[in-house]
Amino acid sequence: MTLWLDPVCPFSWNTARWLASAADAFDVRLMSLAVLNEGRELPPPQRARMSDSRRVGRLMAALGDELGPHAVREAYFAFADHYFDRSAEVSDKLADHVVHAVGAQRTTAAALDDTSYDAAVATSHHASQDAHGSSAGSPLLTINDHTVFGPVLTGVPEPGEGSDLLEAVRVLVGAPQFSELSRPRNHP
């Protein structure tokens, strides 16, 4: 199972925490909302988020390059815990925390602004889109070579509910006839 995510997407954080509680194992790979939205006119708050997306994507790519793809999951959880749950801004201080958390020796906070990692981020992003079969946002989930957008979760299910949700998603993703399921994020 592979979770493709943009590190600054709040819905991806919910999905990642759900999978961590419900799945035996899953990989985390990068997709990039910054790459997805290249060339589009965006309002200022979204432009700022895309800047964070690009910078954190570089850091994750650098850590993956140094430590291997497994490090991206650990780095993501170290980052997201501070970024989402503690409202930390993308900064050298946060990057240093992530680098230290995964035990990197070569990667530093300078990776946030190192454009040499942009190609690796773009390559991973395009792999996510290829796995999905069309343009899609974050998160994407691959189960048994079938990739879907989502699930978009507005919170993290309780442990028993999380296991049930994972089984339901596995069944849906595995059904060749299944295409899409959606409801408003603010449903009653």
List the predicted regions and their residue ranges.
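A short linear-motif detector with a strong N-terminal bias
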Residues: 8, 12, 118-121
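Structural alpha/beta surface segment adjacent to cysteine/selenocysteine redox centers
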Residues: 4-7, 13-95, 168, 172, ...
